[in-house]
Amino acid sequence: MQTHSESKYRYLFGNIIAFLCGNMGTRMIGFLMVPLYTHMLLPAEYGEMDLLLSVAGVISPLLACGIHEGIMRFALDKGADHSLVLSIGLRVFAIAAVAFLPVCALLEAIPILGGNGWFLYGYCVLNELMTIMLCYIRGCDNTRLYAFLGFLSALFTALLNIIFLVVLGMGLGGYKTSMLLSPVCTVAAAFLMGRVKRDFHPGKWHTGLAREMLRYSMVLIPNALLWWCMNASDRFFVSYLCGTAANGIYAVSYKLPTLLSTVAAICMQAWQMSAIREHEERADHRFSQEIYVLLTFFMGLVTQLMLLVNKGLLRIYVSEAYQSAWLYSGPLMIAFFAGSLGTFWGSFYIAQKRMKKYLLSAVAGAMVNVLLNLCLIPWIGVMGAAAATLASYVVVWWVRAAGIQKDVGVALVSRPLISAFACSAAGMLAAYMTEPWSVALGVAAMAVYVVVNRAYVLSLLHRGKAVLHTWRKRQ
């Protein structure tokens, strides 16, 4: 008979597998498309597009008051009226999208954006609508469809880019066109395949619930903007102080760390749903503690593996003009490792809807990021931006953990945590040495990490076998 603990792991691992199938396919498509972009676009063009997408990261949270976050969280509540949640969310989105039209004139007038105001507005509106659809499907606990639609979105983007960049040879204009058409295709697929068509009723409204959803979502607007500061403001500093070509190379340096971020996102999307369940069931803290330790070990292992293959992979992955990007990937990988830990602690705030305290961590991280960008980029160039990102992610993780650790009963410091940071730092520094020493020391750092944490290797294998055994019995 399946125990309560086993059912928790089954639910968590089941969601991880669903998100893995969708997200890894999505990221792999995006990852494999980068060589096409770097061959078809000049570094300055790639840097310009990266800058526009960074600006879109500021506009998107403001556009619809972050209502997609409220849709997902309130749809996950026990006994939620999904139709009402969706109808409120789409009405808020429609009103906000129309109200935001005058901002286009302001965007057109900003010189650095090069007259791309209407493109930014269209891109943000279409992507926000797509995000609302996906968040609603996820909020209905339909993780398989959510993951599949995410994969489909990436596939649409890839196919459209091949058509406009390679077949039609439209250059940067073709890249922009594909970025507008891809979310349209995904929205159509979500509308037809999900419950959106059945559940949306324009006349359905509840003022009390709408206020709750907006209150929850609007706190996340400054949070999203502050995360933008940590993730994208360095692009502006690098573009201004080092040039758009340097920013294009820096943008490529994010590609391998983004794969690490994808692994973390898969685990965290699944964990967030488990954390909400744990909160609603008033469960004890042992499950959360076990997951935190295992997550720390696993993400530390993935980080060191990525550090080991970073330099060699970029040599065959991008054109020669971009190959110096490996220099900046190391600090970004460790930053994303710290970010995955911060996201774990953030899930407790989301489960308890304690959004003001959640916001404080982003404030601290953004302040550190901007200050260090101002100080370090003029001094050490692009490496200063990578170092600032690393420091800001560590600050967010620490502030979040310190703010809620006692309430959730999860220990912050563990053997996997200390060894992960130590061995990852050793692996990062080894990469700057000449070969074969860099490879040898990187492998040695990973071997030490596995030996020190061998008990957690066995624990992961044991849990995985138990879940597989349960699934086989149900077949």
Stretch-by-stretch model annotation:
Residues 8-68, 154-158, 162, 215-245:
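Signature of the first transmembrane helix
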Residues 30-45, 167-168, 225-259, 270-277, ...:
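Helix-terminus/linker motif at the lipid-water interface of multi-pass membrane proteins
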